[in-house]
Amino acid sequence: MSVIKMTDLDLAGKRVLIRADLNVPVKEGKVTSDARIRASLPTIEAALKQGAKVMVTSHLGRPTEGEYNEEFSLLPVVNYLKEKLGAENVSLAKDYLDGVELAAGKLVVLENVRFNKGEKKDDETLSKKYAALCDIFVMDAFGTAHRAQASTHGVGKFAPVACAGPLLSAELEALGKALKSPARPMVAVVGGSKVSTKFDVLNSLVKIADTVIVGGGIANTFVAIENNVGKSLYEPDFVDAAKKLRDEYGIPVPVDSRVGTEFSETAPSTVKKVSEVQDNEEIMDFGDETALAMANLLKDAKTILWNGPVGVFEFPNFRKGTEIVANAIADSDAFSIAGGGDTLAAIDLFGIEDKISYISTGGGAFLEFVEGKVLPAVAMLEERAKQ
């Protein structure tokens, strides 16, 4: 994949606009999880260090487009950045489309792009206004690379130079390493509640990976091929498709499960064979035999791609399966890449962040890349690199 990289450019004295992913959770004006800002900081700091006049922007939440709404302001992010970079070095610009005051080595945060009408539609006029603000546009938001919007795609078409930031470059390299030429055996773990939302991902992965492990509600649909799954979350419409995948690609199906009679944090759990699940019970996690068998498959892997927990790990009584699988991934010598919100929460809970080779910041973009889809922002960068 040939794109211009920010690290290859001289940024000194240049007006640099970085599109980052600073879409973080905010409560009472404070950032409650700073993972995305931390991931973006090295890019911002590298540009400042070179003496660039730096602007950074992002979306946050889902405001009504074209209207300012304090609830979705990037101000909490600005306050966080002031703590990291010094209050005198960071400011917030609310109205910036007609130009903004910049200084070398200083950072101006441009307010939430979704306050601008035309952002989501990739409006050309808006894209040109963004482009006019900068000499170099840096796309560094992998999490929104699958959306063709004015601040992720359109701006790059019209900016004098458009390049990939270090975070985006690292994401693309890590995913490329896992999917384009994986060291074998490659094992993929796909969890989550619905087969329907991950069907394209499963279809892609069975052709790339040597083994695909399914967990969560997805696994229940596979269990339902030959068993009663009681009140479990599963998709009857996808049982035939699941059977086809199982038969054709040898997807391992759980042999035992942790079940409960109600979906609640305090519900007691019982381990039983999948063939013994009663009508009033629901499967909420792998049983021990299944979890250990899956861990065994992961032990010898050379590449692991993990998307989604294998059980309701938020409930202490239904956590063990995800914990066993997570620790097997952490203890493996494989190149491991993990992505998706719930996956990151599980990594956090079990404290294994340092043991995963690469943690992707993208949710939808991660899945679309795995499905083999073209990400509009990446396609734009490739196009610009040819010019």
From Swiss-Prot:
EC number: 2.7.2.3
Keyword Zinc-finger carried by entry: no
Reactions this protein catalyses: (2R)-3-phosphoglycerate + ATP = (2R)-3-phospho-glyceroyl phosphate + ADP
GO BP: gluconeogenesis; glycolytic process
Keyword Kinase: yes
GO molecular function: ADP binding; ATP binding; phosphoglycerate kinase activity
Pathway, per record: Carbohydrate degradation; glycolysis; pyruvate from D-glyceraldehyde 3-phosphate: step 2/5
An annotated GO cellular component: cytosol
Domain of life of the organism encoding this protein: Bacteria
Keywords of the record: ATP-binding, Cytoplasm, Glycolysis, Kinase, Nucleotide-binding, Transferase
SUPFAM superfamilies, sorted: Phosphoglycerate kinase (SSF53748)
Amino-acid positions noted as binding substrate in the UniProt annotation, renumbered to this chain: D21, L22, N23, R36, H59, L60, G61, R62, R114, R147
Subcellular location: Cytoplasm
UniProt: ATP binding residues: K198, E314, G340, G341, D342, T343
HAMAP family: Phosphoglyc_kinase
Assembly and oligomerization: Monomer.
Family: Belongs to the phosphoglycerate kinase family.
Protein name stated in the entry: Phosphoglycerate kinase
Organism, scientific name: Erwinia tasmaniensis (strain DSM 17950 / CFBP 7177 / CIP 109463 / NCPPB 4357 / Et1/99)
Gene name per UniProt: pgk
